[in-house]
Amino acid sequence: MFRVAIVGIPNVGKSSLFNRIIGQRKAIVEDIPGVTRDRIVSTAEWRGVKFEVVDTGGYITGDEDKFAPYIRKQVEKELELSDLFIFVVDGKQGLTPLDKEIANILHRTEKPVIVAVNKIDDPEKEKLAYEFYELGFENIIPISAIQKLGLAELLDKVVEYIPEYEKEIQEEEEKEEKRDYIKVAIVGKPNAGKSSLINALLNEERVLVSEIPGTTRDTVDILYEKDGQKFLFLDTAGMRKKSKVDFGLEFFSVGRTIEAIEKADVVVLVIDANQGATEQDTKIAGLIQRRYKPAVIVINKIDTVDKKTLEKVEKQVRERLYFISYAPIVFTSAKTKEGLDELLEKIVYVYNQAWKRVGTGQLNRAIKQIQNLRQPPTYQGKPLKIYYATQLEGKPPAFLLFVNKAEGFKENYVKFLENNLRKLLGLENAPIKLIFRGKEEEKDK
């Protein structure tokens, strides 16, 4: 989501403006410099467009306040995270040297800045805003956070900067939020038993089933409800090896399988217990992994193999599909209906895990714990460092890690981080995405 940070020196009215924008009194407002010591993040909406808004502590240069270094650090983090800055200045007090210092910092970010000249509670005082053009920013807007003057113009300008694709994503997400079902893509090799599985769930011959590979040529969407939970099953035709795919119906079935994976909330990969995980299953699992999709692996047709064989198949599937180790395995038989209830339970479970939010404190404690187990390696002769991490909006769980050298974090250590984060954060069955953002090494302290 587009992120807007409110910055400025202490006691210029940042928290009052923040409270006006979000429509509730969330930040503490007092006439004491530096009252807001932590960043407060909330979601705001203007003219139907949503964005994140952050109230930062007042920027202080010296250390006369014991919290000054902490506040500076919080503000500096927002310089990286935010997409736009509302720079609040005091119209009554006028331009200060500290305002100029903050302006220089904001110019270096090369991100859009709107200067909100606060405490202009009378239209006749708007001329007091003119001197702030000296800061070198194009957008100077006189406002009064207390009296709500100029706020519409300010927020109109904020929304102008939000990219169209962000607005389109919000519209799609709003549509998604209104639906009350989980979209499930049933994928796998032809004749692995996908359609039979759905028919067994539905107790009816809803999907065409035969012994001929690839009988189901199209993607068939089926809405199903169990114990008050709705599922929309996207039954696909199955993916075949490229050598066997001719242009025409088979070619488009592969494309539709990929499309179903992209649309799905949860992907169910169906594997034939008689064959185990094949090369083609591995490729389908790769599609699931690259799209960070929550998944359940189904070993189907268990009525056709003995227990010892099934144990070997499970081991082989885990070894071959190691890169989606987060996906739980369910054993099913469409013929005897064994494992069907467990399959539905796992679909709901992994779906909920994909939506899980983790507190910033909990996340950073987990990362510290992981580093105590195994420190990041060195890169170009210097140790790699993880400074701070935060969870991004949306699903699946995605974490932004601020590090000294992003390019130094290679697959081996990244996998180590991922696996341990899953354990420590209760995300064992969720795909997680780690994004590394590098910054210059801090000066020797």
Curated annotation (Swiss-Prot):
GTP 2 binds at residues 188-195, 235-239, 300-303. The lineage of its organism: Bacteria, Pseudomonadati, Aquificota, Aquificia, Aquificales. This is GTPase Der. InterPro entries: G_ENGA, GTP-bd, GTPase_Der, KH_dom-like, KH_dom-like_a/b, P-loop_NTPase, Small_GTP-bd. It comes from Sulfurihydrogenibium sp. (strain YO3AOP1). GO terms for biological process: ribosome biogenesis. GO terms for molecular function: GTP binding; ribosome binding. Belongs to the TRAFAC class TrmE-Era-EngA-EngB-Septin-like GTPase superfamily. EngA (Der) GTPase family. Residues 2-166, 182-355 form the EngA-type G domain. It comes from the Bacteria. Associates with the 50S ribosomal subunit. Residues 356-440 form the KH-like domain. GTP 1 binds at residues 8-15, 55-59, 118-121. It holds the Pfam family KH_dom-like. The keyword tRNA-binding does not apply. GTPase that plays an essential role in the late steps of ribosome biogenesis. PANTHER family: GTPASE DER. The keyword Transmembrane helix does not apply. Keywords: GTP-binding, Nucleotide-binding, Repeat, Ribosome biogenesis.
